[in-house]
Amino acid sequence: MTQTLADMRRDYTRDGLTEAQSPDEPFALFHAWFADAVNTEQPPVEANAMTLATVDEEGRPHCRVLLLKGLDTQGFTFFTNYESAKGQQLAARPFAAMTFFWPTLERQVRIEGRVEKVSAQESDAYYQVRPLGSRLGAWASPQSRVIADRDELEGLIRQTEQRFADTRPHCPEHWGGYRLLPERIEFWQGRSSRLHDRLNYRLIDDRWTRERLAP
């Protein structure tokens, strides 16, 4: 018998989340949960995969999956084409939300805050450790723009390969990093009967406060 959408559900029983387990600020807890995800989740799940939501000038939301590439006490860093749709949206409205979901651990983290560009030096440092194909792709692909077909894209790649045949590609000005500076971070731990644990951290006057939310 084929399972219907209404019947698709899973009871979460792996773990709980209490205030006693949680530090006063959220970064230590995120580091701990992220380490758990790296050590537990198996392919095809990528522990650093996240959904990034942005808003355009008309107030319409857009979301897509990206990879987290930096984390420190300032915030969460990702890289992209500044001329892409998300880049234009962030230029117009520099706020975003991220969601991480780790199904094996039955955990989710939601992060919201202001977004700013990282320095050109930081962007170049990450660009230079990317695989060569990815570095060339940053030059070749007019991200988010309409192209005729796959052949056009592959032609742009060939032109870029020829351009940099005898020289190491440098980071293009239209490509680089953003850092989300969190103002809110919610940790969600799945629990039985949908009575999930939700601990919410909010940054108020440069200090983090923690509160429990009803599931």
Swiss-Prot record:
Source species, domain of life: Bacteria
Q: Which UniProt keywords apply?
A: Flavoprotein, FMN, Oxidoreductase, Pyridoxine biosynthesis
Gene3D superfamilies xrefs:
Electron Transport, Fmn-binding Protein, Chain A
Catalysed reactions, semicolon-separated: pyridoxamine 5'-phosphate + O2 + H2O = pyridoxal 5'-phosphate + H2O2 + NH4(+); pyridoxine 5'-phosphate + O2 = pyridoxal 5'-phosphate + H2O2
TM ranges are none
Q: Does the keyword Transport apply?
A: no
Does the entry feature the keyword Oxidoreductase, yes or no?
A: yes
The cofactors required by this protein are: FMN
Query: Sorted alphabetically, which PROSITE patterns does this protein's record hold?
Result: PYRIDOX_OXIDASE (PS01064)
Of which family is this protein a member?
Answer: Belongs to the pyridoxamine 5'-phosphate oxidase family.
Relate the protein's function as given in its record: Catalyzes the oxidation of either pyridoxine 5'-phosphate (PNP) or pyridoxamine 5'-phosphate (PMP) into pyridoxal 5'-phosphate (PLP).
* Protein name as it appears in the record: Pyridoxine/pyridoxamine 5'-phosphate oxidase
Lineage of the organism: Bacteria, Pseudomonadati, Pseudomonadota, Gammaproteobacteria, Pseudomonadales
